[in-house]
Swiss-Prot record:
Its EC number is 6.2.1.3, 6.2.1.15. The gene is Acsbg2. Its main location: cytoplasm. InterPro entries: AMP-binding_CS, AMP-dep_synth/lig_dom, ANL_N_sf. This is Long-chain-fatty-acid--CoA ligase ACSBG2. ATP binds at residues 227-235, 418-423, 496, 511, 624. Pfam families: AMP-binding, AMP-binding_C_3. The lineage of its organism: Eukaryota, Metazoa, Chordata, Craniata, Vertebrata. Catalyzes the conversion of fatty acids such as long chain and very long-chain fatty acids to their active form acyl-CoAs for both synthesis of cellular lipids, and degradation via beta-oxidation. Can activate diverse saturated, monosaturated and polyunsaturated fatty acids. Has increased ability to activate oleic and linoleic acid. May play a role in spermatogenesis. Belongs to the ATP-dependent AMP-binding enzyme family. Bubblegum subfamily. Keywords: ATP-binding, Cytoplasm, Developmental protein, Differentiation, Fatty acid metabolism, Ligase, Lipid metabolism, Membrane, Nucleotide-binding, Spermatogenesis.
Length: 667
């Protein structure tokens, strides 16, 4: 019986042979049935990661693969050097006692060492486990224990000290720790510097490593990704070799970026590699297409990203909504400081850009003559200021992009393609690109995959369910959770609510776990309301709706502020855009405290006016915001309110600001 027939039988809910591997497994050493299509997309020959890596190392051998900043210059590794360095790391891991299917934890910011460890681990037959650099010691302990981490790779002394806070009896599986950035401040048994670690395996023969590589199968686990825990305890998502290699190939096709032809594609790595979106775009797709990955500075998200972009000028750029929002703020601030003539030119070009690109979106290609002028006078300069002048593909993932941000960049000739998915589907499920694009849509289903809307209502809105070679193996050691995510026919239930239009574009309208159910039994999806509030009130940074089991809805608001460049913490000082908003109203406020202490009348009135506009668009009275409160500090990753990709951690926020929430319902 062929793999295609077995997968087809299981999709129908039947199993023709009892000995067939299941579509799921919760064990590190488990094997699953691959979801091969009968023909076309999804029918490609399965490959292991080592097979893909070796093929690319041979094909792109002399091309630069990785680049990291060393003072004022960039040090690069070719694909050939990259592959050999990963083999060297693999031998050292074997020397340290790494066995098949044992886990190697990586704790630190994106770097050559991070990626080499990940690939070295997989070549050595182990499983790569990324740990978010922002994790607390307790969160690190959870991952180490749950995955039985065998070897731990940490970035620097700061991360090492975090690990040393974990009680030794909770680290019994850890055989060794490697620190990949100097200086090495501690001296202890089984602690190695990166250079010493890389020399450990010199006496391991090539044939020993090759045997391990040849023993690997495409339907076995290669990577474990931990969910960010925005809706509960993090779970270890098991991804197979085929999940990774097939999805990287499918995405390079959908993103319209192929193997090297003429100019090499370049990417800037700055989003945490522990997240599937970054791992796919910064490691796996570049290996597939022969792209060059530049590593940004560790403080990229605290303001230095734009300098790296201006220097590197990537051809592909992936952002999360918060990054695009900050870029929008920067552009607006620059325009606000410009002359009256430049402001007029900017407004004219934006209006023309939105008109032309909206037509393009619908398949119309007629471009007016003055569009070239707008491109030269405005669009090209905006791209250059962002470091995106060589960029031909722009993407956003991790959470929905607002209509305001999407149309703002579309009007500047920067169409941002949304990618929708989750860790459990190896990253993407639907993709938008410049050829397949609609504002507010996250595109069409990845070729070779299937989509189902489960339990649809009369408007055609239902839970998004997925089938394809991108669907994960299961959750590590969590059978019950795995069987909640995968139904009896193998469909992955996303927990997201969406609808399809007549052209098969997917629109996500909410998330089941985030829906608020009022005391009157009304279901309210918070994201559309929160997004509208941020669009209507320019001073608002974050908005979070509350009111589960309550008589009415309330909202927590934070204001746009400056950020501490070193710590990433939001400051009390208002951002340039926020100050401009206040000045336009006649307020002299320059800090959040100024607004809160005096309960600045004009600012509060303006916010209420924006809330009133949002309420006018409410579906019913139960969807209206009755009360709101401004918090003293903006949300941040460091403060615990945001996840690694800047998603709201609703349960954390609800608990942290319980007193403020209670005050709205008691007053």
């Amino acid at each position: 019986m062929t793999q295609e027939k077995k997968a087809e039988d299981l999709e129908r809910g039947t199993d023709a042979t009892s000995a067939v591997p299941r579509l799921w497994s919760t064990h590190c050493d488990g094997e699953v049935l691959l979801r091969l299509s009968k023909h076309g997309p999804g029918h490609e020959t399965p490959m292991t990661i080592p097979e893909l890596f070796q093929e690319s190392a041979e094909r792109f051998s002399a091309y630069p693969a990785l680049a990291s900043k060393n003072g004022k210059k960039w040090d690069t590794l070719t694909f050939s050097q990259y592959y050999e360095m990963c083999r060297k790391a693999a031998k050292s891991l074997i020397k340290l006692g790494l066995q098949r299917f044992q886990c190697v934890g990586i704790l630190g910011f994106n770097s050559v060492e991070w990626v080499v460890t990940a690939l070295g681990t997989i070549l050595a037959g182990g499983l790569c486990v990324g740990i978010y650099a922002t994790n607390s010691a307790e969160a690190c302990q959870y991952v180490i224990q749950q995955a039985n981490v065998s070897i731990l790779i940490v970035e620097n002394d700061q991360q090492l000290q975090k690990i040393l806070l974990i009680p030794p009896d909770k680290m019994e599986t850890v055989k060794a720790i490697v620190q990949y950035k100097l200086p090495l401040m501690e001296s202890m048994a089984n602690l190695y510097s990166w250079n010493d670690f890389m020399e450990l395996g010199n006496d391991i023969p090539n044939i020993q490593l090759d045997r391990v590589i040849l023993s690997q199968k495409a339907n076995q686990c290669a990577v474990i990704l931990y969910t960010s825990g925005t809706t509960g305890t993090p779970k270890g998502v098991l991804l197979s070799h085929d999940n990774i290699t097939w999805t990287a190939g499918a995405m390079s096709q959908e993103m319209e970026i192929n193997r090297v032809s003429g100019k090499q594609n370049t990417i800037v790595s700055y989003l945490p590699l522990s997240h599937i979106a970054a791992q796919l775009t910064d490691i796996w797709i570049p290996i597939k297409i022969g792209a060059l990955t530049f590593f940004a500075q560790p403080d990229a998200l605290r303001g230095t990203l734009v300098y790296t972009l201006q220097e590197v000028k990537p051809t592909l750029f992936m952002g999360v909504p918060r990054i695009w929002e900050k870029m929008q703020d920067t552009i607006k601030e620059n325009v606000a400081r410009s002359s009256r003539l430049r402001k007029k030119a900017f407004a004219w070009a934006k209006m023309l850009g939105l008109k032309v690109n909206t037509k393009r979106m619908l398949g119309k290609r007629d471009i007016p003559m003055n569009y070239r002028m707008a491109k030269a006078l405005v669009f090209a300069k905006v791209r250059t200021s962002l470091g995106l002048d060589n960029c031909h593909a722009f993407f956003s993932s991790a959470s929905p992009l607002s209509q305001d941000v999407s149309e703002f960049f579309l009007s500047l000739d920067i169409p941002i393609g949304e990618i929708y998915g989750m860790s459990e589907c190896s990253g993407p499920h639907t993709v938008s690109n410049k050829s397949v694009y609609r504002v507010l849509s996250c595109g069409k289903v990845l070729s070779g995959c299937k989509n189902m809307l489960y339990n649809q209502n009369k408007e055609g809105v239902g839970e998004v369910c997925m089938w394809g070679r991108h669907v994960f193996m299961g959750y590590l050691n969590k059978e019950e959770a795995t069987l909640e995510a995968l139904d009896e026919n193998g469909w992955l239930h996303s927990g997201d609510i969406g609808r399809l239009d007549s052209h098969d574009f997917l629109y996500i309208t909410g998330r089941i776990k985030e829906i608020l159910i009022t005391a009157g039994g009304e279901n309210v999806s918070p994201i559309p309301i929160e997004t509208l509030v941020k669009e209507k009130i320019p001073i608002i940074s974050h908005a979070m709706l509350v009111g589960d089991k309550a008589k009415f809805l309330c909202m927590l608001l934070t204001l746009k502020c400056e950020t501490d460049r070193k710590s990433g913490e939001p400051l009390n000082k208002l951002s340039v855009e926020a100050k401009s908003f206040c000045q336009m109203l006649g307020s002299q406020a320059t800090t959040v405290s100024d607004i809160l202490k005096s309960r600045d009348q004009v600012v509060y009135t303006a916010i209420q006016y924006g809330i009133d506009i949002v309420n006018q668009q409410a579906m019913s009275d139960s969807h209206r915001i009755r009360k709101w409160i401004i918090l003293e500090k903006d949300f941040s990753i460091q403060g615990g309110e945001l996840g690694p990709t800047s998603k709201l951690k609703r349960s954390v926020i609800t608990q942290k600001y319980k007193a403020q929430i209670d005050s709205m319902y008691l007053s």
